[in-house]
Amino acid sequence: MVNRSDLVVIGISVGLALGLLLALLLFFAIKWYYGRSHLRRCANEQNSPTLPVHTAKRGVVIPDDRANTESSQPPENGAPTQHQPWWNNHTKDLTVSASGIPRYNYKDIQKATQNFTTVLGQGSFGPVYKAVMPNGELAAAKVHGSNSSQGDREFQTEVSLLGRLHHRNLVNLTGYCVDKSHRMLIYEFMSNGSLENLLYGGEGMQVLNWEERLQIALDISHGIEYLHEGAVPPVIHRDLKSANILLDHSMRAKVADFGLSKEMVLDRMTSGLKGTHGYMDPTYISTNKYTMKSDIYSFGVIILELITAIHPQQNLMEYINLASMSPDGIDEILDQKLVGNASIEEVRLLAKIANRCVHKTPRKRPSIGEVTQFILKIKQSRSRGRRQDTMSSSFGVGYEEDLSRVMSRIKDQHVELGLLAGVKEENHQERNIATT
């Protein structure tokens, strides 16, 4: 006969067994439920893929509508459509990304640009078109080209960085488009175009006076200073050039095109060569390692462009090296449009800064903060009326006659330096042939 204590033990054992069984069933049920949810999420992600974009503090996801957006046609070169205030009666497919930048669909930009009719320029990302946005403001729509050297990575970098970087000397990104295969970036409209066009655009282009060039150098320096010393983490631009310096209606400069930019997490970083020939730091070219001083080198080249109006791809550095053989060599390669309208002392001071920036040893180049202070001192000296040596005053009596003589001398010097640079290039090519 089973006693009461045995019944109690049996009851407890059965209860524990049932409890354990129920716990196991509950565990497997939860695991099955989450497994189904995960599979469902994966299926949704395959149907609506996304492009991850990372900001300094959180991930930003730019939806990719290649799989679920209504079909749209690429820009055609036909006649422009009649422009109408489409935003008054059109419900835009407009969202705001986590970075705070509005997102437009392809048809929005197509209408804003009047079917991509007015071309403002052409860059490494693709053509740039004039646009009128829903709020009536002018904008520049940069459209990713099929033969572009840049892709989704550069596009994501631009949206990510400009979503968190804001400064008066950086071009403002006001919107973007990700619609099927279309990638577009919408910027504030810069009415005076690029510094490159103003310096080399030929006849009919506005001539930049010396005061404007000095201010442009300071504006660029402020923009880079924000990237290097104000942003957290710091940002290296990696493609500073006159084509990426844009000017507004007041000739104030802003740095543009951040597709190749990198956040600085180490003192120096290794990368495949990216940038533009003529502006790239020779140390970066030889080592594949870039630092903030690589940006300083590129900025130095831009300053020399402002002084000489000689393009880096037209042997600018050869001219500079040859001119440095003479104490007043920079005077000889000064942009002819500035002769008689610039302070020689200021030109020499700015050239001195530029030469430090393009020093072959990166550690001997100044920081961007130092460059800014140097340029500010030149401007402050100008504002206090401390200019002591202008070309017009240095010529003295018979100014017009002397000016004509100086112009002739500068032209002769340009020709002579060009011949010397050509000879040096021929010798370099002969050495290359001899070694192959």
UniProtKB/Swiss-Prot annotation:
Keyword Transferase: yes
Top class in the EC scheme: transferase
This protein's record includes keyword Phosphoprotein: yes
Active site: D239
Principal subcellular localisation of the protein: membrane
Polar residues composition-biased segments: 69-88
Listed transmembrane segments: 7-34
Membrane topology: Single-pass membrane protein
Region (Disordered): 65-88
Catalytic activity of the protein: L-seryl-[protein] + ATP = O-phospho-L-seryl-[protein] + ADP + H(+); L-threonyl-[protein] + ATP = O-phospho-L-threonyl-[protein] + ADP + H(+)
Residues modified as Phosphotyrosine: Y187, Y284
CDD domains: STKc_IRAK (cd14066)
Family to which this protein belongs: Belongs to the protein kinase superfamily. Ser/Thr protein kinase family.
Protein name: Calcium/calmodulin-regulated receptor-like kinase 2
Upper classification of the organism: Eukaryota, Viridiplantae, Streptophyta, Embryophyta, Tracheophyta
